[in-house]
C-alpha cells in the first residue's frame, strides 16, 4: 500500500462511531499492545465493543512464536466467516506478530482478512481502516527502529494492576525464535516517560505494575545512561506501596546489580521469570543462547543467596534440533537442581526464516518430542506440588484479582512471589491487599484463609 494514498484518505470514524472488537492472543506484551491500540482507536473516534456480535470491526492481535499459536488464529478466522457472510461490511483485521510474519501473503491464504498491521504500525490503524472501509485491502507491516509508543496513554480496563512496556524488540537472535523478525530491533523508552506513567498509575490507584519487554535486562536509555537495575531502583521510589514486577529476562543479561535492587526494595516482588529452554550446554550453544548450563546455575545461586524467598519460573523446549536422550536428561536434572515454581513447556516447532530453520535439521521425531515433554511436565508438577505444600502454615500478602474460576464464594489473587492464592470471601474487594494464611495447596494454587 502506498503511503501517499494513505495520506489522501480522510478519517471519518469520528462521525460514524464504528465499533471495534479486540481479541488478544499470546504474551503479556500483546495484551499491553491491545491497550495501546484501544487508545489510538478511541482517540480517532472509534468505540471499543465488548462483543464481536455488535462490532463493525474485529481485530485479532496475534502471536507467531509457535505453529500452534498461528493455527489458533486460522481456526478463529474460520469461525468468523458466518459473521462476515451475515454482514459483508464487517472488517476483519489481523494485527501483531502473525501479520508481520506473513504480511500480504495472509490476504491470499485467509480471504476473510481485510487489514493487516504489524506491531510498529498501530498509529496508522485509523488510515488503514479508512482504506478497508472503502473496499481495499489495507496493510502496513513496516518495522521501526524508533517506535516505542511512549506518548500513548494506554486504555486499560483493569484498575488495580497494569502492564507498562519499557522497551520493544529483541537483538538476541536465538536460533529457534521468530520474535526479532516480527518485533524488530531493541528500542528502549526514555526513563522519564516510564517514571511519569508509573506516577500516573499510582495517582489512579493502581496497586501493581508489571514492566514489560522481550528482554528487560537489556533496557538502556541512551539519553540518561540508565540501565535496567537503575530503572527498577527509581521505579520503586515512585510509590513504595505499589508492587512492581517485570518480565521477561534473558539469563545472560540479568545482573548482580538488579538482584541487589530487588533484595533491597520492599515493593519489588520476589519473583523472576528466567527462561532457560534447555538444561544441556550443547543445546544452549545450538540455540545461540549466549550462556552455558553452568553460567545459568551461577545466576540462580546468586538469586537464591541474595533473595532467599524468591520464586523462579522458566521456559523449556523439548525436542530441539539434534536433541539426544542425554540432552533431555540434562534438562530433567536442571529442573531438579533449580526447583522452579512452574515452567512453561513446549515441543519445538520450526519457525520459518529463523536460524534453526535455515541451518539445522528438525530431526527429533514428534512422538519422541511429546514423550520428552510429558516427562518434563510430570517432573515439574511434582516439584511445584512439593514447593507449594511447603508453604502451608505461611502467611502471604495477596492482591485480590477477582473471583476464583472454580467458586464464586472464593477470591483469587497473587502473592508477592507470584503464587496464585484462593481464599473464602470476606469484607475485602478486588484490588485490596489481604494477608492470607495458607492451609492447603495443589501443584498450581495455594489455599488459605484471610487474617
Curated annotation (Swiss-Prot):
GO terms for molecular function: 4 iron, 4 sulfur cluster binding; metal ion binding; N6-isopentenyladenosine methylthiotransferase activity. One of its GO terms (cellular component) is cytosol. [4Fe-4S] cluster 2 binds at residues 170, 174, 177. The keyword Ligase does not apply. Residues 389-451 form the TRAM domain. It catalyses: N(6)-dimethylallyladenosine(37) in tRNA + (sulfur carrier)-SH + AH2 + 2 S-adenosyl-L-methionine = 2-methylsulfanyl-N(6)-dimethylallyladenosine(37) in tRNA + (sulfur carrier)-H + 5'-deoxyadenosine + L-methionine + A + S-adenosyl-L-homocysteine + 2 H(+). Residues 156-386 form the Radical SAM core domain. The keyword Iron applies. [4Fe-4S] cluster 1 binds at residues 27, 63, 97. Keywords: 4Fe-4S, Cytoplasm, Iron, Iron-sulfur, Metal-binding, S-adenosyl-L-methionine, Transferase, tRNA processing. It is found in: Cytoplasm. SMART domains: Elp3. Binds 2 [4Fe-4S] clusters. One cluster is coordinated with 3 cysteines and an exchangeable S-adenosyl-L-methionine. Its EC number is 2.8.4.3. Catalyzes the methylthiolation of N6-(dimethylallyl)adenosine (i(6)A), leading to the formation of 2-methylthio-N6-(dimethylallyl)adenosine (ms(2)i(6)A) at position 37 in tRNAs that read codons beginning with uridine. Monomer. Belongs to the methylthiotransferase family. MiaB subfamily. HAMAP family: tRNA_metthiotr_MiaB (MF_01864). This is tRNA-2-methylthio-N(6)-dimethylallyladenosine synthase. It comes from Chloroherpeton thalassium (strain ATCC 35110 / GB-78). The gene is miaB.
